[in-house]
Amino acid sequence: MLTSDTRDTDACVKEALELAEAGCEIIRLTAQTKAYAANLENIARELRAAGCHVPLVADIHFKPDAAMEAAKWVEKIRINPGNFVDKKKFEVREYSDAEYREELDRLREEFTPLVLFCREHGRAMRIGSNHGSLSDRILNRFGDTPEGMVESAIEFAQIARDLDYHSLVFSMKASNVKVMVAAYRLLVERMNALGPDWNYPIHLGVTEAGGGEDGRIKSAVGIGSLLTDGIGDTLRVSLTEDAVREVPVAYRLSNPFQPSERSDDPVSFPEPELSYDPLKFSKRQGGLAMCYGVRLGWEQPVRVAVPDAGFYALQTEREAMGDMMPELSLGQLDAIEVDPRCDADLEPLKELAEPSLVTVKNGLAMEPVYAFRLLAARIEDRHLILLKDTLVPGSVSGEDVPLTAARNIGSLLCDGIGDAVLIQGESDPRLASFLGFNILQATGTRLTRADYVSCPSCGRTLYNIQEATARIRKATEHLKGVKIAVMGCIVNGPGEMADADFGYVGGAPNKINLYVKHTPVKFNIPQEEAVERLVDLIKEYGRWVDPK
């Protein structure tokens, strides 16, 4: 998605050409008003004249008239069903069935002109639910849930289908990766139940993932988990960085799932019965074990381990590592290694008197996610599971290491599987430990520092969000468990903050509004003062501790 102001034709064309050169295959621009949408004509014309024919998408919030204007000039319209017609007021009320139908009739009346225009002019449409911006109507009936996200999109899609329009794409984005994964899975189940003619493409993304390694890991957990499940046709990695930096990360995530050039018939394996509900998160409740004074399992945090040599090398850095210090070595864990397909490996586990830590053997020709899902399905619940990022240490390298680890371990954590994690793909024990804790942080499994919801910036952003995010992180990263949202604008920012404790939101050019939960409490603060005022606000609400 472009970060340039949509009214600035030259800047948008330059950025779009850079994205196309980097390999971006679809380019999205914000169109927050009809005037912004009208300039898409100039942008599209200049791009086509420059030989760039990458499809353009207009991103629409709140403004049906902007959508109608944008549809004249671009190949695709993205609407948010949470705010295309409904205005979010955070009101709590009960809707009778009759009142709910009246609201749907109003929605149909507002939405129909856009559907008919797109149908007649060959435009595509993405119906993109966002967890943080569900309408009051949906929230009051379905709650702030994956079910609400899916129903919100299905309502719009049904109207489109009634008008014989089918050029639809769905997305179910959230900053909480467990919610995101559950919502996409629920969407697929719902589409399957509605019938084979509901087989529409699906666009993947973790909204407000942030920047740096945190943003990449969070995106890899959410997007990678779904790609592993066979879900997804397009994807966008939302980083609080220059847009062109998102593209190589997207390719690294998608490359393992691209169709093979080999002509061999695919090999199918019987699916084991799952030991968990893939549509609702629930932690697998194993027994309780003790390893060298460290409790594992029942109601304990997921532990981080590293290979023996690395663990002992880190002992001199214990103070510097702080909360990111691995708690155990692989040898101390004394995990039982098994092939989850082999009855001879699994039968002895039934004879053990006490809960034991079990893991999958290295070297097996199995994808880690499938191997550990099978293990969880085949061993007794009382036994604990040590997750591994790879079963073939050394098989990945460079920037693929954290993305692969996040995809494999993160997917399993989102399924509630895992009592300890071992990073084998990273040879540096310090980096391996950091990676393990960062994956736990990204999945919300275990928080060792502040958590951030940071939007990737777009043409609506009213200040330098990359600089502000870096300053906020530097000032607050030590606040374990505090969640801070850094949002570019007030158009969609307050809703997209989701469950953040505090919000830092652009209110006017270079002016910041500060929020507590969804409530704005400080207004029009000059950007150069805003981080300090945010710290004061955190102190005022009793969430501040001095850094060590």
Language-model segments: which ranges?
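Hydrophobic faces of well-ordered beta-strands that scaffold small-molecule active sites
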Residues: 1-3, 25-29, 54-60, 77-79, ...
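Glycine-rich, proline-tolerant flexible connector loops at the mouths of alpha/beta enzymes
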Residues: 3-8, 22-47, 81-102, 168-177, ...
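Short, acidic/polar
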Residues: 7-18, 62-68, 153, 219-223, ...
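N-terminal active-site wall of soluble small-molecule enzyme domains
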Residues: 31-73, 311-314, 320-322
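Hydrophobic or amphipathic alpha-helical targeting/insertion segments
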Residues: 53-91, 97-117, 122
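Conserved, mostly hydrophobic/aromatic
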Residues: 59, 127, 170, 226, ...
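Catalytic alpha/beta core domains of metabolic enzymes, predominantly
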Residues: 95-111, 116, 138-285, 343-486
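Beta-strand/loop-dominated core regions that host nucleotide or nucleotide-derived cofactor-binding catalytic loops
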Residues: 509-512, 520-543
